Amino acid sequence: MISVIKIFFALLFVLILTSNLFAQDSFADQFNLAKKLYEDEKYFDAVTEFKRLLFFYEGDNYSYESNLLIGLSYKEAAKFSEAIQHFALAELNSSTEAEVYESRLEIIKVNILRRTTQRAFTLLDSLENDVRFNKKSEEINYWRGWAYIFSDDWERAALTFSEIQKAHDLALICDSVDNDLYNPELAKYLSIVPGAGQFYTDEYISGLISIGWNVLWGYLTINAFMEDRVFDGLMIGTLLWWRFYSGNIQNAEKFALEKNLEKTNSALHYLQNDYNGRKP
């Protein structure tokens, strides 16, 4: 009787062990399937499979990498809030300093992409002040440069990249963009002389039109006062001359801002499509 009981428990143990082994193989297959979907750029399918794995698997073996790849999938789909959520979960499930660093860096990159750059700067400072990552200062500075790019501070971006390498490709690009930008305040002040602000922003036709209207209404206003037509002079001066004079100032500043936007968008388009280095 005792031998029968022993055999029963031995068989039960073997069955349980076999069941666990099959389950482990099943989870490994599920993870590999999800990872393959991610590599094939089927991001939403990958997210579904990773989440299915995390729901059924009670261990921690797949938690870090699954959450990291879910975050990267959401990032590719421009679902930035969801991406940050899963990068944060990846950090919580990290087991090495390298994993902590990678997950935090991904959160920073997403903040750069969605232009919450102040948050990115705060996280970069936190990362830089962490003694565990003292040897990562150059890479941290690299992403700080990108944060300056996305906050439209091309001058500081150029300075930041040049700290890494004097003739860094991105330093040269950012410096070129910064030198090519118009100064909206200068355009505004130049427009005290009608048309000068437009000439500064290469809007020559607009500048000539502005000069023409201001000369015309200025002449008519002054002429009205000289002929003692005070009411006419006031009406022409306030309703027409002042309107065109103030419009000339506003237009010059607007042209500078619009052209700067075109230039920065063109630079960002180049960086996105033609720059071969690391990007957020």
Model-derived regions, located:
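Alpha-helical segment of the N-proximal tetratricopeptide repeat
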Residues: 25-56, 76
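Short solvent-exposed coil/turn linkers within tandem alpha-helical repeat scaffolds
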Residues: 54-63, 91-102, 128-137, 162-171, ...
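Hydrophobic alpha-helical membrane segments
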Residues: 65, 79, 99-102, 109, ...
